[in-house]
Amino acid sequence: MLFRSWATTNPQRRARVMFEFKRLIERDMNTLAEILSSEHGKVIADSKGDIQRGLEVIEFACGIPHMLKGEYTEGAGPGIDIMSMRQPLGVAAGITPFNFPGMIPMWMFGIAIATGNTFLLKPSEKDPTVPVRLAELMMEAGAPSGVLNVVHGDKTARSEEHTSELQSH
């Protein structure tokens, strides 16, 4: 099962994938902005801003190994020690709106993937090309196939289909 494989991948290895993903987005910034502009209608400067604001969350995700350490408090009370562990949850999902097709998907999947979860993304049917390209870049960065999954279709049909599917797991 892919989730278990990705969840048990060393956090530093997952961070390296995120660093490479960040580098690839920076490399392809102009192309992504042109795609977003032509498909959505935003001017290039706004399109670059959309991508850049999503990239800022990816930059944060690159430092995830430090955040995954958990905590230990000895002597929190008489005979009480406290230990917290952070573990991946499983499959996360996001249905994104049309207005920020680069930023919002990265806000959703960046942290989820960096912390060892897999992600199911349903972008808006009005402008899905940038999210699809982001998934391709994630694979190019070294994430195994299936870590970031993109599905398409009418929002009503897809929402009902995947909501019931996710609830059954």
Spell out what each predicted region is:
Residues 1, 55, 93-95:
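Alpha-helical structural elements
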Residues 53, 64, 137-140, 169:
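A short linear boundary/processing microfeature
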Residues 1-2, 162-168:
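Short, small-residue-biased leader/transition segments that mark boundaries at the very start
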Residues 3-68:
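Glycine-rich loop-to-alpha-helix module at the N-terminal edge of alpha/beta enzyme cores
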Residues 50, 154-156, 169:
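Short, solvent-exposed coil/turn elements at secondary-structure transition points
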Residues 11, 89, 168:
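ATP/adenylate-binding site constellation spanning eukaryotic-like Ser/Thr protein kinases
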Residues 18, 62, 96, 165-169:
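Generic short alpha-helical hydrophobic face used as a protein-protein interaction/packing hotspot
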Residues 70-164:
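Rossmann-like NAD(P) dinucleotide-binding subdomain of oxidoreductase/dehydrogenase enzymes
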